[in-house]
Swiss-Prot record:
Gene Ontology CC terms: autophagosome membrane; cytoplasmic vesicle; fungal-type vacuole membrane; phagophore assembly site membrane
Species: Emericella nidulans (strain FGSC A4 / ATCC 38163 / CBS 112.46 / NRRL 194 / M139) (Aspergillus nidulans)
InterPro entries: Atg8-like (IPR004241), Ubiquitin-like_domsf (IPR029071)
Covalent lipid adducts (Phosphatidylethanolamine amidated glycine), residues: G116
Highest taxon of source: Eukaryota
Gene3D superfamilies reported for this sequence: Phosphatidylinositol 3-kinase Catalytic Subunit, Chain A, domain 1
Gene responsible for this protein: atg8
Membrane topology: Lipid-anchor
Keyword Protein transport belongs to the record: yes
Protein name: Autophagy-related protein 8
Pfam families: ATG8 (PF02991)
Residues making up the propeptide: 117-118
Single GO molecular function: phosphatidylethanolamine binding
An individual GO BP term: cellular response to nitrogen starvation
Length: 118
């Protein structure tokens, strides 16, 4: 899936920003979180997050649910490289495994399990 953030900001600018963030906040992970285009779930109010390295994927999902004011009975799925990451995984390990060449971790979310298997 194409990232709107990548389309709107040149590579050099993204890379410099991620490097600056990592230098200033070594214990935080720069994350870009965007909605899967065709999903009917609410659009998030901000795309950029500085996530504590020891946060789990499940805790990050909770943050996203709160930001889009998603009711408890509604499902939300997050994807990293079009794959559902394990809920108990630390964001730091997901970052090390899947960070983009610009230094950001790109996460997409959807109300449907649109990629792969659970």
């Amino acid at each position: 899936m194409r990232s709107k953030f990548k389309d709107e900001h040149p590579f050099e600018k993204r890379k410099a920003e991620a490097e600056r963030i990592r230098a200033k906040y070594a214990d935080r992970i720069p994350v870009i979180c965007e909605k899967v285009e065709k999903s009917d779930i609410a659009t998030i109010d901000k795309k950029k997050y500085l996530v504590p390295a020891d946060l789990t994927v499940g805790q990050f999902v909770y943050v996203i649910r709160k930001r889009i004011k998603l009711s408890p009975e509604k499902a939300i799925f997050i994807f990293v490289d079009e794959v559902l990451p394990p809920t108990a995984a630390l964001m730091s390990s997901i970052y090390e495994e899947h960070k983009d060449e610009d230094g950001f971790l790109y996460i997409t979310y959807s109300g449907e399990n649109t990629f792969g298997d659970c």
